[in-house]
Amino acid sequence: MLILEKPYVSETLIKTAIEQHLPVLRNAMSEQIVANGYPLHLYNDEEFVAAYQQRGRLYTMSENALGWLVEHLPDQELLDKIALLKDKATFRRICQDMYPDFFFCEEEIAMLDGIQADKLPYSLVLKPSVGFLSAGVHVVHDVQEWQAAIRDIQENFHKVSSQFPEFVIGTQKFLIEAYIHGEEYAVDTYFDDQGVPTILNIFHHRFANESDTSDRLYCSSRALYDQYEESFMNFLVQLNKVLQLHDFPMHIEFRYDGKKAIPIEINPLRFAGFCLNELQTHISGLHPITAYLKNIHLSKEEMWQGKEQDTYSFLVLERPADAAPEQVFNERKFREDMMDVLELRPLADPTVGVAATAFIRTDDAHKAELEHILHLDMHDYMI
């Protein structure tokens, strides 16, 4: 069962939903897709709730769907789990036994400017206890940056948070936690009806340098699974001893500090956004949402059979801020410059800020291509 929402629904997922006769909630997004010629199986609110009570598994495209769940879904256990995972401070408390040395605390927003900034253990991350995207998030390294962050929150946070319900972005409390140094990774997983976790994707989020915060490049490979799958799986098993999740998908971001994987945040009831999760479709031919809804457990041996030496990557190719509205992505040049472009998805809307997304494959002989991608000047790919 699917709830399709902005910002983006791929044609791959649409076709998967049609082929597998998946119930889709009737809303503005799904109706627009049907109007574009795709015969989705749409259910109104009452029909969708009734189907959920029979099927028991639900997938949402983004945080935008959470408001509908709160209003319509009579599954308080599920709603409580979502609320718990959305609350970053509560999540840190749950993980405290696993990470006893990790610093964090929670404060009322009105009390932030009264904190003795010179007593804090920098570097820190300051963010809403309940948040969405990067709204209200600040990385602070010293007292001056702390004071600047507090001023920004006081002046601008309520303007941003007012666009979302309290369930999506909380406005009362902020979490202060240690900044986690190390490489960034992400995992798509689901817990089956017995609470057993299955990992469907492991990504390495690569950056050009320490100041880079873009989503330009995510990579996956058999070597990545060999190195990190056990560590991530151990975390999931320990987490579910507390949460008791079942029939539940999630996307988790980690930092690996050289000794252990530390979770940054969890996104409940969905996998990686903007179709990053569909990298698995190119690796194994299986859509991860199908795997979750059909209870398919995929081993890394099955996933990477015959592709053990390859790296599969997902690219978000930003549209230059100064690109003219009539400029479009140069698909031919991009294909010529890359070893193996598996799929290219140009975005025509200049307001999105993304020129295209791409799925690519590289082998050992072309590893340098990935580093080159991190430094691409996107002006070279606009015509």
Model-assigned labels for residue ranges:
Residues 124, 198, 262-265:
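Protein kinase-like catalytic core scaffold
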Residues 29-119, 363-375:
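Conserved N-proximal alpha/beta basic substrate-recognition cap immediately N-terminal to
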Residues 1-37:
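Short, charged N-terminal beta->alpha structural module
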Residues 124-154, 184-188, 208-224:
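Glycine-rich phosphate-binding loop of ATP-grasp-fold ATP-dependent ligases
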Residues 293-383:
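Peripheral (often C-terminal) accessory segments that flank ATP-dependent C-N-forming ligase machineries
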Residues 101, 143-181, 242, 380:
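Conserved ATP-binding module of the ATP-grasp superfamily
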Residues 240-277, 305-311, 315-323:
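Conserved metal-phosphate-binding beta-hairpin within the catalytic cores
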Residues 178-181, 188-244, 267-296:
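ATP-dependent carboxylate/phosphate-activation module, predominantly the ATP-grasp catalytic core
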